[in-house]
């Protein structure tokens, strides 16, 4: 390699990067806690503004955090350029940092809530832009970074912003992590979400249990039947991620609900799988089963 070529290779400080990642990780950001997510949005916006990036912050709604867009301090903003996409929320609740997911380093591996998905990647986008400015470098195309606050629950409030930004871009780089062995992710499974409501009949558990129709018992049977749709061999998965029901310990439960997650890879008839989730005859004819939802993101 010539000296000229070597001089064009950027130099990065690994410890500086890790310190920045840790700073982001230690601000806990569960998707449904908009106030918590916005604490990190504040930090990111401040860091990007400091290097001259133009930031636009769109207030969140429905309890979610704000959407943050940052444009590099160069290039024509109207020219199709490079969009870097990341999310700032995680699946972990407040308190995970102090209990189940304490930040720690073991050799070359670092652990913490959301560090893999995807605070490390999101931070690297910010760091790269900072590094370009610090080194006096520019890309040929304009660069914008879009950080969303609720990707882990399907981007219900930021989807329109993502699609609009993507349409204006020539290239899109998503900062999600690689897979085992450093494999690059180039596609995603289709993703669907469904809500199930089961209505039974309440009765006193002590004096008249025979008069009741347990919505929870029906839910248990439905849960097993739903998850039997999963086929690991082809990559189809159906997971009942949340379930609840009942009103009191001494009452046969008249109501139960569940939230269902569906993943379908390319090449699979997603509509057929969706119908198997939606069409739910009751095991107990005295219970009513209702399912709503569908595919949120196609494969």
Regions found by a protein language model. Give the residues of each.
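A structural signal for isolated positions on well-ordered beta-strands in alpha/beta enzyme cores
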Residues: 83, 144-146, 290
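Metal-dependent amide/peptide-bond hydrolase catalytic core
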Residues: 1-12, 29-30, 47, 59-61, ...
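Glycine/serine-rich anion-binding loops at beta->alpha junctions
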Residues: 92, 109-123, 204
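Acidic/histidine-rich catalytic neighborhood of metal-dependent amide-processing enzymes
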Residues: 118-189
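Predominant activation on well-ordered alpha-helical scaffold segments within soluble catalytic domains
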Residues: 22, 45, 123-130, 159, ...
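Phosphate-handling active-site elements
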Residues: 77, 106, 128-144, 226-235
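Acidic/His- and Gly-rich active-site-bordering loop/insert found
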Residues: 2-113, 134-139
